[in-house]
């Protein structure tokens, strides 16, 4: 911790309390941003579920073009003051976010020593009113790398014992961004210096969402099997991002960003199951429910562990689509693709892709498997899947739900059906038990899914473990559509191992 360097050594020897720091290192944290633009519902949602959080991040402060900070709450008035009081009463940290996303203003303020110091002081004064401060400066030019690091250093030295949290971009491995090897000049030039962030940030929130097409390796893999692929955050991508980040930033500081919103796309289908995606807007899950009802369609869980549905609106508009008379026996994507292929033409349809409670819970389990400190939810405002809270609570307090018991042998017949992400059942628990019998394919090191704590749910961590199993035994690789899917070949090998347990 940064304040230790400010305490004389003899005082430190007298007053150092080891259990506090040991506890902090072993706690899995669940934090969440509470946005100002829905202040009443956001704060009410956070207050109602405050005991399920270890930290709230009121998303209320914004840096202005002149480098001053504006309080958009205001934080000292209801409902924000009520949120703060409730959090403090329940021993939940309050770390307000200071946001900024104006490249020219960031360049002007941060590159000038006097204005940079003034911003450090203003941010530190906010931190001292709470448990710390969260810095969310986005879209900075790469040439601000040195100056932003100087800002973090100055802030870190000014806040005393308070925490400095940094929100940083999700870096996709360059080879996955450009699998064809044609890497544009300047790729890999970032304004955030991860080494300095590791030094001057006590917590680091990785913004692992808004993936879209950044991971071309995964997009190409989906396209090769004619799958729709426009995820908010594919667990495979999240895993790659976190593993890359952990090369520079301590896992004990990292929280994985978890989205609660989705995207609607206007998709054009071309001959041969080829698709072009144009983002229309973001939405909360309630909107998807409305579309389900209007068009009599049902969502399915996709390979990215998110829900998706397709439909063809009667009239293309820039507002919410109206009801359609399309034959609902046809899935819109399949109908559009069939039309485009038969006529060697193209056809448009809509795609909704969004995370639900299962997606959020699986991200938490993945974060545990990756060995990071916790998850950071964006956003808490009453618009998320209402089942999210019980899903998170279940992960935290019901580690033995669906368990096969601690370390005993498996009393079960062989695996009889194909298994994939999103499925559940006692055979999933058997699958996890087999995978956990080998340390190189274990589902999780601790918590739900770990040895002795197997569950009945096939989530992102189970899928990653299946991939490791398939790679180990040469059954499938990342370029194979069956990667992470328990089909006949994988099941045969699993059953052979099961017979020996």
Model-found features: residue ranges?
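Conserved, mostly hydrophobic/aromatic
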Residues: 56, 135, 204, 256, ...
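Acidic, Ser/Thr/Pro/Gly-enriched interdomain connector segments
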Residues: 99, 401-456, 461, 499-501
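Glycan-recognition patch characteristic of GH18 chitinases/ENGases
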Residues: 25-122
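Extracellular LysM carbohydrate-binding repeats and other cell-envelope/extracellular binding modules
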Residues: 394, 455-464, 468-501
């Amino acid at each position: 911790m940064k304040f230790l360097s400010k305490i004389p050594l003899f005082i430190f020897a007298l007053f150092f309390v080891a259990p506090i720091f040991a506890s902090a290192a072993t706690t899995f944290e669940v934090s969440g941003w509470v946005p100002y633009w829905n202040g009443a519902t956001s704060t009410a949602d956070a207050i109602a579920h405050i005991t399920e959080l270890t930290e709230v991040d009121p998303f209320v402060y914004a840096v202005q073009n002149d480098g001053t900070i504006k309080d958009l709450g205001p934080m000292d008035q209801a409902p924000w003051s009520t949120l703060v009081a409730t959090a403090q009463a329940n021993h939940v940290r309050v770390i307000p976010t200071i946001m900024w996303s104006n490249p020219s203003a960031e360049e002007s303020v941060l590159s000038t020593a006097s204005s940079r110091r003034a911003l450090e002081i203003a941010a530190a004064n906010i931190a001292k009113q709470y448990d710390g401060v969260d810095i969310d400066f986005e879209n900075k030019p790469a040439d601000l790398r040195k100056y932003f690091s100087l800002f973090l250093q100055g802030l870190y030295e000014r806040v005393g014992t308070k925490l400095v949290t940094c929100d940083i971009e999700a870096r996709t491995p360059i080879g996955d961004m450009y699998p064809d090897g044609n890497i544009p000049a300047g790729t890999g030039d970032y304004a955030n210096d991860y080494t300095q962030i590791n030094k001057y940030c006590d917590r680091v929130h990785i913004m692992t969402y808004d993936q879209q097409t950044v991971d071309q390796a995964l997009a190409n893999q989906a396209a090769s099997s004619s799958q729709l692929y426009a995820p908010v955050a594919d667990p495979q991508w999240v895993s790659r991002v976190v593993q890359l980040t952990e090369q520079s930033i301590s896992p004990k500081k990292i929280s994985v960003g978890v989205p609660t919103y989705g995207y609607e796309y206007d998709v054009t289908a071309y001959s041969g199951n080829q698709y072009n995606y144009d983002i229309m807007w973001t939405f909360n899950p309630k909107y998807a429910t409305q579309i389900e009802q209007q068009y009599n369609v049902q969502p399915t869980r996709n390979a990215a562990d998110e829900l998706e549905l397709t439909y063809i609106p009667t009239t293309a508009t820039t507002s919410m689509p109206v009801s359609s008379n399309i034959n609902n026996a046809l899935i819109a994507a399949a109908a559009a693709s069939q039309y485009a292929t038969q006529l060697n033409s193209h056809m448009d349809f809509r795609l909704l892709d969004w995370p639900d409670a299962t997606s959020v819970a699986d991200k938490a389990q993945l974060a545990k498997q990756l060995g990071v400190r916790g998850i950071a939810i964006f956003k808490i405002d009453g618009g998320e899947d209402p089942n999210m809270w019980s899903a998170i609570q279940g992960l935290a307090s019901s580690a033995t739900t669906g368990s096969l018991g601690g370390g005993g042998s498996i009393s079960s017949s062989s695996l009889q059906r194909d298994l994939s992400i999103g499925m559940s059942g006692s055979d999933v628990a058997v699958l996890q038990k087999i995978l956990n019998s080998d340390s190189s394919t274990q589902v999780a090191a601790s918590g739900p899914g770990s040895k002795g704590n197997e569950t009945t749910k096939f989530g992102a961590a189970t899928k990653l473990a299946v991939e490791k199993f398939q790679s180990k035994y040469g059954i499938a690789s990342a370029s194979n559509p069956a990667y992470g899917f328990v089909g006949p070949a994988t099941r045969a090998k699993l059953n052979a191992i099961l017979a020996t347990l």
